[in-house]
Amino acid sequence: MHLALIIDDYLPHRTRVGAKMFHELACELYSLGYQITVITPGFSQKEYLVKDVIDNISIWRFKSGELKAHNKFKRAFNETLLSARAWKAIKNQLKYNTFQGIIYYSPSVFFGPLVKKIKKLCNCPSYLVLRDLFPQWCIDSGLIRKNSLIEKYFRYFEKYSYDQANHIGLMSEKNIEIFTKKYPLYNTHVLRNWANQTPTETSNIYREKLNLQDKVIYFYGGNIGKAQDMKNLIKLAKGMMMYENAHFLFVGQGDEVNLIKKLIVKWNLNNTTYIPSITQSEFKKLLSEVDIGLFSLAKEHSSHNFPGKLLGYMVQSIPILGSVNKDNDLIPLFNKFGAGFIHINGEDEKLLNSAIELYLNKNIRLQLGNNGLNLLKNEFDVTTIANYITKKLGV
């Protein structure tokens, strides 16, 4: 059985959570006996199609403009052309029996036309791994005006993407509730995020490199954007200034990088360090060295996301500290397993008190970290996810 995996972000050139998760899924499917081809954009290539192999996974990179540009018009333009550029690059590689199933990831919402063409040619089913409800989160955050032409534009492609899916997997029960209010006719179910459960051996490379040998490291790794409300975590770092061995380390890329850099300087935060994105292998080494995993979701969100970065924390038995939008079902899930301290965004004093408790009590850090690993094994196992998706596809 040959499966096509379609995503706008992939290793090794990108290290965002979606790229890591899809590669882990691809590797798991391969271990189960499937042939896997990942179809994804390439951003610095001259050829229309470049083929590559990573960990036995075949990768077809089609020529594309930059998707993560700060210029939002340029970004939207290039995303709109994703399907057209992909089809132009790969159509001569395809026959009626090339693929027996398609698994595609959203965001982006612009792969609907490509999925439709492949489904028609290969007569195969498709499964949509739906993570962020775009453009809804942009409307919630005020980045897109409700009922504007730009909303209607994105909504058209959003629905077109959903129309191509035989099955749609969302992150949580709350997200299904929100989704079905607007789109009631699709075949939806809960599909958690996932992770390979093999931890990385502990190292001290980054502690030595950054002169953090004796520090309690509060770590944030991943997308640094408006949806994460990064100022929320920088305020936490400011509140922890009196604790001399507490250090905040931010690693990643996104629209809010300049904001956190400015706030570090403005507030003279000598307990905070930012470094740009690093490779997946280096990221795993760094995760093995930190003490507390941070995350944040903007309070304006109406959807209820499960940040993929939490999986990396749980693999390494790192206790989790974060804040979410109101009624997010992460709170009861983490409370059930005792895997960390999660508060509603805006409860700054509670967040700070939890940060202090984790700083002062190593035993609590160890206990919460072990509980997080148990949560991972129960809810987010990549083997379970792979088997579930292939069962839905009937392959």
Please name every model-derived segment.
Residues M1-S58, M240:
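N-terminal subdomain of nucleotide-sugar transferases
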Residues L49-K51, T200-L212:
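A short helix/loop element that forms part of the nucleotide-sugar donor recognition site in Leloir-type
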Residues F110-P113, K117-L121, S148-I168:
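Membrane-proximal helix-turn-helix segments that form the acceptor-binding/catalytic region
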Residues M171-K174, L191-W194:
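Carbohydrate-associated surface elements
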Residues K209-Q228, L233-A237, L249:
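Conserved donor-binding/catalytic core segment of Leloir-type glycosyltransferases
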Residues Q228, T279-S288, G293-M314, P319-P332:
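Nucleotide-sugar-dependent
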Residues V251-G252, V257-K284:
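Nucleotide-activated donor-binding/catalytic signature segment of Leloir-type glycosyltransferases, i.e.
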Residues E357, I364-N378:
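A short, well-ordered alpha-helix in the C-terminal region of glycosyltransferases
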